[in-house]
Amino acid sequence: NQLGDGQNSRETLKVDWESILPIKLTENSISCMMTKEELMRKAIELSKENVANGGGPFGAVIATKEGEIIATGVNRVTASCDPTAHAEVSAIRAAATELGTFNLSGYEIYTSCEPCPMCLGAIYWARLDKMYYANNKTDAKNIGFDDSFIYDELELKPADRKLPSEVLLHNEAIKAFEEWSAKEDKVEY
């Protein structure tokens, strides 16, 4: 299949697929751009798969605003014996590793359920631009995942909380804070 100039058509006809298709071409793969609903369905699908695999009913997806999935996560608390391995935290860890940064601004998270206080804190710390969720706190409470006591505890002074706490060696510990504060080449987060 030759063109008039004698060159092979594969070499001559080059198409800029990225400009005409809703996909992102990468070195090793083609990533489909998804709608917000498709991204949420992916998070829900992950939560269902996780239940089938013996895990909790939670899934999360981190994506670009254009709909490219960067990372996913499921609840791995029982599988990994890690009480912090919630779907959102797992997705944040995977995205940060994939992107090589702790700052996930410019990205959005889709989670099958409204985040618990820990995950909400992680979402803020990761600086994600927007959060979408399907099930809410009441839905989670109705199946045994009630976080209301944590929200209640956060409103109290440390001395009034159910978890006993005590300040120890503050004068020694503050030195690390002072050293970090004075450091000119620190990376703030």
What does each of the following model-derived ranges do?
Residues 2-13:
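Extreme N-terminal basic, low-complexity initiation segments
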Residues 16-51, 115, 122-189:
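Zinc-dependent deaminase
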Residues 76-79:
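A short acidic/small-residue loop/turn micro-motif
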